[in-house]
Amino acid sequence: MNILITGIHGFVGSNLIMALCEHHTLYGLDIISPEKKGVVRTFLWEDIETTSFPIQRLPHFDAIIHLAGKAHDTKNQSAAQVYFDINTGLTRRIFDFFLESAARKFIFFSSVKAAADSVVGDILRENVIPTPVGPYGESKIAAEDYIKEHFVLSDTFSVNKGKMFSFKEEIVRYSDKQVYILRPCMIHGPGNKGNLNLLYNVVKKGIPWPLGDFENKRSFTSIDNLCYVVEGLLTKDVASGIYHMGDDEALSTNELIALMCEAMGKKPHIWKMNRKMMEGCAGLGTLLHLPLNTERLRKLTENYVVSNEKIKSALGIDRMPVCAADGIRKTIKSFEE
């Protein structure tokens, strides 16, 4: 297949290229266009504008994978509009291009944060009513909404001011196309510099984890499992729709730290400080504007479990190829290199 991938120089893009380049012909679309191993050519965003680069002069693409976007800023220093300009604006541009092109498949990388900032109940599934919090999740759901306004997903309908759109012409026009909205939870793997790397640096210094009394569960996404799912969406006849993505097993922060220490050959230092006492300290931190406050404590200790049953059923598999623990071990060992 000829595949166009946006955001190829990022963490996920680089790993996808390594996973796909052996059996597919890959093209890039990014804000920079240096040569990249495994990529035939990288186009710039202005190249897909028909006014400057007619679509007839571009290669024939069988599929488009849209990765480009602004990641969640954990320091909250980015202006809200930047998220919408990039996460929503670029999605509109590339999806419009997809609809006009001969490409048959479109994979959009959204996020579970487009669905919910916190999980209500035991597990987050695709049928949840989206309630994003903050510009990252809000810009992602806005991008999803744009896609649904212009393409009928098999398990969703689009709504505008309480009225359903009439899609008869579009259904006929785009009946040969398939569109997938992927909502992965936290992705990790070699080359990842996100939150997992921050926790790794704390553990590596031997700093004790004082929140061992909180037994939370969180879902993660191994980059190997993610690449496996993308390959499946590209090569199998999977129905268009929204799919959550995560490893089979959810891990507690205590288990995560233990796995990190195991990979580093260190003994874990997990302190089970009294839960009520830690909640009181966090409350005081809120009043005094200290690093550990009530909101940060909630984020560090809450459950965030994501179901992957729908995507596994769509691909016809019972389990992901990599278990959560093995994926974490591989990531941590890459930090050590």
Predicted regions and their residues:
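NAD(P)H-binding glycine-rich loop region in Rossmannoid oxidoreductase-like domains
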Residues: 48-86, 97
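N-terminal Rossmann NAD(P)H-binding glycine-rich loop of SDR-like oxidoreductase domains
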Residues: 3-22
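Conserved C-terminal active-site "lid" loop/helix of NAD(P)H-dependent oxidoreductases
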Residues: 223, 258, 281-318
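Active-site Tyr-X1-5-Lys
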Residues: 134-154, 165-180
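Flexible, glycine-rich beta-alpha linker
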Residues: 177-197
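Substrate-positioning beta->alpha
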Residues: 192-198, 212-234, 240-241
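Conserved Rossmann-fold NAD(P)-dependent oxidoreductase catalytic core, especially the SDR/UDP-sugar
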Residues: 93-135, 154
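Mid/C-terminal beta-alpha module of Rossmann-like enzyme folds, strongest
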Residues: 236-292, 324, 329-332, 336
